[in-house]
Amino acid sequence: MIASRYVASELESVTRKLELQLYERAAISEVLEQTSTDLELAKANEVLQTIKEEADACVAAINGGQKFYTIKYDQILSGLESLSGGQWSVGSPLEPLIRDGISDYLHILLYYALLSKNLAKLPQLLLDQEYYGHVSRCSWFMRLFYGLQIMPVKLIEFFRGHALQELPSKLRQTLRIHNFQLVGLPTQRAWQWTKLPIAMVDTDIIQKTASLDSQLDINVKKFGKLLREFPRQKSDRLEVLSDFLDLKPGSSEFAVVRAVQKWNVDSCAPQPNWIVRYWPTILIALAGGPAGIAAIWNARNDIAAFIKHNLFEFARDLVKNWLVEPLRNIWSTVHHDPTSSIAIMSQGTLDTEINSLQRMLIDFLKEHEYANTVDTSVLMKEIEQGNLTQFMEIYEAQLRKPIRNLVTGDLIRSLLIQIQKGKVDGSLAIHGIDKLLQSQQLVFGIVSISPALLILYVLCNSLTKLVKYGTVWSKGAKYRRSVSVSLNNVERLLNSPIEEFDGDKGNWNLGLLTLEMANLREYGAKLVPHSRTAEWCRDIDEMASSSALSTTGKLNVINRIYHVYGKYF
């Protein structure tokens, strides 16, 4: 939380100061003996220990990164009440020490409580103000729908505030009719009275916006004054707290604690709750509810079959056919499993085709040449290389006497050999394609698994958003916009001379600056990676500290935020 480090350091400073003063006192044995015999002093010491335990718990919560720590007011109030009527021993050496310790701890804890409540409630006022500003900028249809949403609430408020007998007079004050002409409307034509609902909605929005502006102005100024005065007035912090709580000067610590416990900021014009926003939808659903429920019940078997087929079986087949099988194929490819090779033609087809061609050519050449002149080994190598010179010479000779060779069958045999040669060439081409496919088999396996990986990535991303943001829909754009707006407002407020204004202007700027830094810290922590959240909070806390850095130093921190964390926004 913003300024929590200041609270923790102040509480630790009080503890060190108290321990040092105890050490500097007279003999500890005498002190303990006197404490045991003086009932009021012993009771005060118990109250001090109770408040100190509360302070230590608060420091531990701050150091542990807890957003807000809830103070146990009942224990503090019961302890203060027990001391309210007690008489202290005259000349007790521990009397001022215990009194000061209780007051110091108590004032800082109360300051932390008010700080926590303001940082929790005032941003909600800003959100309410932004909500009504957004509604005012919507189209006339959306403004009419907003009017429909709040109509039941408005009617209830109206009838609670006015008796039924006063209703006609109130309506006449709202809309006066003279000689069948509407008076008081922004237009001069009577038929444009249809714009009255829009005018009423706009008036309601303007009134709520004005009320929120006034409430924000008062509370932000008081918050800024508390932030400014409490660290300065170390000797009169109780009066600073009393002034913030609008208590009388000189109020007791018991009264201040009670006032802090009850203090709260409720929006004078909160956003409509979900019942107000969705009652038209709920009403429509209830109107068609019985028929819809009956239709669903009658079609329950079809719905169950649809869910089974399109959800469960889809998930099973997706994992089996698009994840497990491609992974198995990729594993087989990496291990050079011959049974998993991709091929267009069956294995051994090319060798069979070539061997058949070799036998056909050798037999053909032996029949047309002297058998002893044919070197079979050389001829087989030539055929493997595609060299058919001897066969083509015989074929060319046959073409000189085609009819005779056709009758004898030699020409037909030559043509069949050439057909076989074409088959071999085709098999060689297909074999080359097979080699290419086998070389890219790993790529094909990865491509085949890509759809399943994409679906798994979307599911994992949705689950991460559900855990981190509480919804499967992305809020990154919303958080980035909020961070951008807060950074702009912080830099604008830092450029204004806050230190030069000690009145309402300075208090307003300081309070608004602290609220913007709190929003910046909260929304930025959702965008920054978890490993860098501590750095982000440290930088924002440095910028929020009123004494750690000057205005120039804080502006330099803004520049560092842009440079270091800009890629996340």
From Swiss-Prot:
Involved in the mitochondrial expression of subunits 6 and 8 of the F0-F1 ATP synthase. It is found in: Mitochondrion membrane. Signal peptide: none annotated. InterPro entries: NCA2 (IPR013946). GO terms for cellular component: mitochondrial outer membrane. This is Nuclear control of ATPase protein 2. Keywords: Membrane, Mitochondrion, Transmembrane, Transmembrane helix. It is a multi-pass membrane protein. The chain crosses the membrane at residues 279-299, 442-462. GO terms for biological process: aerobic respiration; mRNA metabolic process. Pfam families: NCA2.
